[in-house]
Amino acid sequence: MNINAPPKRIGIMGGTFDPLHYGHLVAAEMARHEFALEKVIFIPTGNPPHKVGRRVTSPGDRYEMVKRAVQDNSFFEVSDLEIQRKGYSYTVDTLKELHELYPQHELYFITGADAFREIFTWREVQSVLSLSHFIGASRPGFDPLEFLEELKRDYPEFLPNMHLFDVPALAISSTDIRSRVKEGKPIRYLLPESVRLYIEKTGLYRI
């Protein structure tokens, strides 16, 4: 065993995934390649505190859709870690559990540019920043300068853990997909066919 070998890296992609679409998958695959991640674990949120008061599809259905979406990529996995947790799901708790499961690995949390900018509002933000690297999937029009200046001012020690990278611009959103289903419009080619068939079979988003 080479004791000087760098630690292996695991990508973490958390989200409501209501539903998961090609935008999520492209960002995960690009990050896996760009940051030499051993694998990417998709973790659907259980009871997300930021969605209080909003209608969210059941954890079981969201988990099943993610499972179907990632089954053809040997570098992708899905975890029910947050779904099984009672109460609200906080990123800090998830990262602590993952560190126990993968003590020899570095964690890389993959998120969109908008969520990347909101990290300072997360519960126990200092612990969150110390537990994982963060990868922000940038998009056209996103200006990271304000975020980076805030990071330099308040948490300069964590600046090396924050990474931005460009991903192909895909104008796809879960909100739009739900609206299209409700309006009877096609969603083919916006998300994996296995997910589309699951939505059709279960009648999700029709009302």
UniProtKB/Swiss-Prot annotation:
For this protein, the record's InterPro entries field holds:
Cyt_trans-like, NadD/NMNAT, Rossmann-like_a/b/a_fold
- Cross-referenced Gene3D superfamilies, in alphabetical order? HUPs (3.40.50.620)
Which Pfam families does its entry note? Answer: CTP_transf_like
Per the UniProt record, which EC number(s) apply here? Answer: 2.7.7.18
Superkingdom of origin organism: Bacteria
The answer to whether keyword Nucleotide-binding applies is yes
Asked if Cell division is a keyword of the record, the answer is no
Biological processes, Gene Ontology terms: NAD biosynthetic process
What reaction does this catalyse?
nicotinate beta-D-ribonucleotide + ATP + H(+) = deamido-NAD(+) + diphosphate
Q: In which pathway does it act?
A: Cofactor biosynthesis; NAD(+) biosynthesis; deamido-NAD(+) from nicotinate D-ribonucleotide: step 1/1
Question: Top enzyme class of this protein?
Answer: transferase
Q: Which keywords are on file for this protein? A: ATP-binding, NAD, Nucleotide-binding, Nucleotidyltransferase, Pyridine nucleotide biosynthesis, Transferase
- GO MF entries: ATP binding; nicotinate-nucleotide adenylyltransferase activity
- Summarize the protein's role: Catalyzes the reversible adenylation of nicotinate mononucleotide (NaMN) to nicotinic acid adenine dinucleotide (NaAD).
Protein family membership? Belongs to the NadD family.
The name under which this protein is listed is Probable nicotinate-nucleotide adenylyltransferase
* Native source organism of the sequence: Desulfitobacterium hafniense (strain Y51)
The gene that this protein is the product of is nadD
